[in-house]
Swiss-Prot record:
The gene is ureE. It comes from the Bacteria. This is Urease accessory protein UreE. One of its GO terms (cellular component) is cytoplasm. It is found in: Cytoplasm. NCBIfam families: PRK13261.1-6. Pfam families: UreE_C, UreE_N.
Length: 170
């Protein structure tokens, strides 16, 4: 089965009205536009998203819906550093340092709380900066992601040289 478009999200439906099968993804797999997966019930799924969400796939995104059957995304829990800032200045420092490492940053559950995937060097940096943090297991859902840039995107247009193209060296 090839999926080219998302058809909604489970949060907009009553999941009890449907037979729901899930595709379990790690947080870093949610930004894939082309991939193959197996559902929990063993169905082969291929995605080739034409209009992929800028932030990536989110918890509960519906890949397939037909009558009473749904195949949806489940983002697996992973080891995460929960960061609690004490001030706006500390928020700026956290965002700068995490961004400088090109690490992913997510909003947390409360104001001034952030999450980032666990990496020992990041944890050591936060300790060195004196930023309050703890390592927990939780979901990193794309809808809570602070950054939206997608590295190495392919252009959706064709480039060709004009017939009168010339290179002039001076």
């Amino acid at each position: 089965m090839i999926i080219e478009r998302l058809t909604g999200n489970l949060r907009d439906l009553n999941p009890l009205d449907f037979k729901v099968d899930y595709v379990d993804l790690e947080w870093f797999e949610t930004r894939k536009k082309i991939a193959r997966f197996k559902t929990r019930q063993g169905k082969d799924i291929a995605i080739r998203l034409k209009d992929a969400p800028k932030l990536g796939l989110s918890q509960g995104d519906i890949l397939f819906k037909e009558e009473k059957e749904i195949i949806a995304i489940n983002i697996l829990d992973s080891e995460v550093i929960h960061i609690q800032a004490k001030s706006v200045a500390e928020v700026a420092k956290i965002c700068y340092e995490i961004g400088n490492r090109h690490a992913t940053l997510y909003y947390g559950e409360s104001q001034f709380e952030f999450k980032t995937p666990f990496e020992k060097p990041t944890l050591a940096l936060l300790e060195k900066l004196g930023v309050q943090n703890r390592v927990l297991s939780s979901k990193l859902d794309s809808k809570e992601r602070l950054t939206v840039s997608m590295p190495h995107n392919e252009p959706n247009f064709k480039v060709s040289l004009a017939s009168d193209f010339k290179v002039v060296m001076k």
